[in-house]
């Protein structure tokens, strides 16, 4: 990308990198299973952008001046240690592998809903569409570099916004409204989980869970922009003020994340 992405492209790129299949699958699933605990994701995406506003522009300036293009480059250059840079790069790869695996699970879920690679078929028939999708994505990214996810992000993010807006209006109108949704969710969360002997969760964070909620949200906020794909997106910005401007604009995605989390409650209210 040659550090040439402006505010508009960077907004879609960073938003697309951060809000992925995890957003659509894991967050609603946690809200579905445990209630308010799943909204930690909304809290940490609110906290992360002030951190980005303060530290990311300085990171970009040093990387641009020294020609760094990855977190490993940055650490190796700043600390003069090839081993430390290699350790950071290896840690980034290992930490990203589960993240990538979740994206593949998301793709598989979408293909299954579309009737492609049905679970009822053989393992090969089920996995072949996923392998093809991954190969196409990998080849496109290899050939086009960072421009590939940036271009895809335009289409993907627009579809996300449209899908969420339609779903948040249409689905409640079909299953009894928000009062019914929260009523059903609350009733389920109050029931006792046989495995733990405690309620499944609650609609609001209870005092006993406040520290767990807060530390999980804070730790996630501190870690989000340490992921290699997020740092690379920052490095691709054209100027320092592009990063600051995006730190101010990216919370729009947090609003959408909050609406997506509500899908978990909606799923609970859908008749079996």
What are these regions (language model features)?
Residues 17-18, 45-49, 92-96, 134-138, ...:
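Residue-level recognition of pore/gate-forming positions within transmembrane alpha-helices
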């Amino acid at each position: 990308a040659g550090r040439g992405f402006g505010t508009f492209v960077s907004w879609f790129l960073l938003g697309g990198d951060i809000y992925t299949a995890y957003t659509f699958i894991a967050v609603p699933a946690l809200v579905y299973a445990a209630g308010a605990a799943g909204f930690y994701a909304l809290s940490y995406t609110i906290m992360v952008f002030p951190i980005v506003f303060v530290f990311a522009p300085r990171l970009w300036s040093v990387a641009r001046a020294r020609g760094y293009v990855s977190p490993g480059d940055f650490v190796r250059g700043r600390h003069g240690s090839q081993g430390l840079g290699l350790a950071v790069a290896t840690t980034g790869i290992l930490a990203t592998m589960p993240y990538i695996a979740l994206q593949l699970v998301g793709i598989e879920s979408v293909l299954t809903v579309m009737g492609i690679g049905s679970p009822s078929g053989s393992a090969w028939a089920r996995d072949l569409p996923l392998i093809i999708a991954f190969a196409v994505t990998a080849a496109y990214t290899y050939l086009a570099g960072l421009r590939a996810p940036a271009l895809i992000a335009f289409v993907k993010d627009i579809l996300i916004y449209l899908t969420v807006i339609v779903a948040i209006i249409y689905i409640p109108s079909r299953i009894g409204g928000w009062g019914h949704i929260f009523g059903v969710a609350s009733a389920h969360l109050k029931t006792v989980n046989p495995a733990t002997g405690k309620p499944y969760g609650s609609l609001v964070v209870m005092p006993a869970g406040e520290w767990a909620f807060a530390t999980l949200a804070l730790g996630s906020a501190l870690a989000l922009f340490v992921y290699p794909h997020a740092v690379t997106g920052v490095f691709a910005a054209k100027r320092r003020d592009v990063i600051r401007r995006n730190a101010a604009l990216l919370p729009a995605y947090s609003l959408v994340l909050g609406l997506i989390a509500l899908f978990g409650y909606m799923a609970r209210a859908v008749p079996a």
